[in-house]
Amino acid sequence: MEQQRPKVGLGVIIKKDGKVLLGKRKGSHGEGSWSFPGGHLEFGETLEMCARREVSEEVGIKIKNIKNAAFTNDIFKKEQKHYITVFVTADYSAGKIKIMEPDRCDEWKWFKWNALPKLLFIPVRNLFNQGYSPF
């Protein structure tokens, strides 16, 4: 029997004009909640490589000034999943925001940090509850 182990997720906190970019999740755990672009860290990948790849795949934009920010320990009881989520910050660089994965995201929207939507994806909620601020 294979032992369950936590997985490593990455969230990219993209900043522009004092706001952060969040997407409304669908088709996966956390459906209906708002989350940063991101995903799984692949074997041999740096955090910066993962951030650029995930943002390109999900949002279709370029980012710059990627910096390590924080991490959370996230347990999804209902789904029986456990993640260590590493967050990086990045500045918006170029491109038009698009829904690149319509089966996974309903919309992308900019929010002020002190006015985030109520229904946050567990890692984002945990990050906010830690008192973290990207500004």
Which stretches of residues belong to each language-model region?
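A conserved beta-turn-beta hairpin within the catalytic core of GNAT-like acetyltransferases
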Residues: H29-W34
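The catalytic Nudix box helix
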Residues: F36-N68, V88
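Hydrophobic pocket-lining residues within nucleotide cofactor-binding pockets
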Residues: L41, I63, T72, Y92, ...
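Active-site-adjacent beta-strand/loop module that shapes the phosphate/pyrophosphate-binding cleft
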Residues: T72-K96, V124-L127, G131
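NUDIX/MutT-family hydrolases
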Residues: T89, K98-Q130
